[in-house]
Amino acid sequence: MQDLKHVFSYLKPYRRDLFLAVGLVFVECIFEMVIPMLMSDLVDQGVPSHDMQVIMLQGSKMIICAVLALITGLLYARFAARAANGFAAALREAEYRMLQQFDFANLDHFSTPSLVTRMTTDVTVMLNAVATGLRPLVRSPVMLFMGLGMAFLLNAKLTIVFLITTPILAAILAWIVTKVGPLYDRQQTAVDHLNGRVQEALTAIRAIKAFVRGDYENEQFETVNDELAAASTNTFRYAVLNLPAFQAVMYTAIVCIMWYGGNFILTDRMTVGELTAFLSYVLQVLNSVMMFSGVFLQLTRSLTSARRIRAVLEEQPALATPADPIAAVADGSIDFADVSFKYSAAAARDALSHVTLHIPAGATVGIIGGTGAAKTTLVQLIPRLYDATSGTVKVGGQDVRRYSLAALRDAVGIVLQKNLLFSGTIRDNLRWGDPNADDETLWAACRAACADEFLERMPDGLDTDMGQGGVNVSGGQKQRLCIARTLLKHPKVLIFDDSTSAVDTATEGKIRHALAALTDVTKLIIAQRITSVMDADMIVILDDGKVHAVGTHKELLANDTIYQEIYASQMKGDDADGKGIQR
């Protein structure tokens, strides 16, 4: 219940609408409670004597009460809808804001499809709990106690008959809830799996088409779809027992009341009108119990969703800004002091092991190594996307953990291995680097990244629509736009994570020439091609998470066997310094 309490705390801004809705339910119940008493007078006084005045008067009162109950019901719907939708919007916003604070380590705890489900399906469950569950939650106990009170006033002995049904109904409800509760967890997990399959298929739709794997993907989707159908069917199988079981008990109680009530009428201990009113109250009481059982099942499902939502809201970011942070990075110098790192405490071995490096400000550093050498892992520690497990990473002479996260990451520009662009225009995407950049600044960055070559051929230039995920440009064009976007940050440290692999060597040469002019920026270039790093001030060779060698192109070519092997496998040339290369 603590999960529900925590999640429902987001209803606080909508307490006025909530209280008005609850009050209107009370008023509606009062009007509905009056109607059977009016009907009793009509049956006992108006019908036997054929007194039309009594019939019209009591009938008019019943109609007025019914209309007023309808109006209060409609007003309730308005206020409840406003509270429920505001509550759902607040939940989604809180979850999304928390996601923006998550670090990579936090995101490792949740799958992307699960996070999507928690922000959509689970929030919708909570919305429905308020929008459709509030009325019966308030109405059922009010109708129950008011109905019991009115029935007791009419005939105390007859009231005992349907009071006997209460423990029976409670036992049925308890049994159903114990069965259904765990099944809702499985159902939501199945929704996660379905969303994951759909997301993966849509993301990789071009590969699916290229490899003609549509039938295979259909089979994979059918598997998770069947899993969801089976989980939903199992849940429904128990939840649906609620209505017929309660109806069976309810109708049995009504038959008993009719039999005993008929005897009371025959012995002049009760009138026909009183029995009619009594039956109305009995139906209201039993319906309220049925409503309450439905609300209980809804709350059981809401509890599952609340637990999943709370897990996101209470996830503590793995990285945090210190209490008294350094607000600016002095320069682009970088130091790794005996740094080791593993992605999780349970990992069997370190991804990086005892790395020690000094990179002066303004230097150009190439980083090479085989697949899995931890090149990307190394540079991710610089903007503090992860914290080192042991050792110290410094930028600008200060431990990265002493900086404000925003200040540190603003000072570090990363061109990712995977080129990420967003829906919108090219201008919108470039302004991620500098929201206030004018067209002249944007074009200057594009020229440095050689993106102007294709932008000038586009009719709309910077206003060209990128399409979803940048589908309207090629891989090489994406890379150049990503480079331009990062240059617009004017960072002190610039990291290229194999980010020129999709451009031709001539274009790469132009980009390297433009970057060479950025003498006050420290540049780290992760590359597979020797030509991308051979002019660097320093080349770092990583092997299995360890620094194998550090030196210039000439030094490594003369002294390091791994570098010599990489060089020999990629090119043939006349000079050991790499000049006169034939490609």
Could you describe each region identified by the protein language model?
Residues 13-16, 104-105, 121-130, 134, ...:
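An intracellular "coupling" helix at the cytosolic face of ABC transporter transmembrane type-1 domains
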Residues 35, 39, 76, 80, ...:
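Hydrophobic/aromatic residues in alpha-helical transmembrane segments
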Residues 50-57, 150-164, 234-308, 312-313:
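Helix-loop-helix
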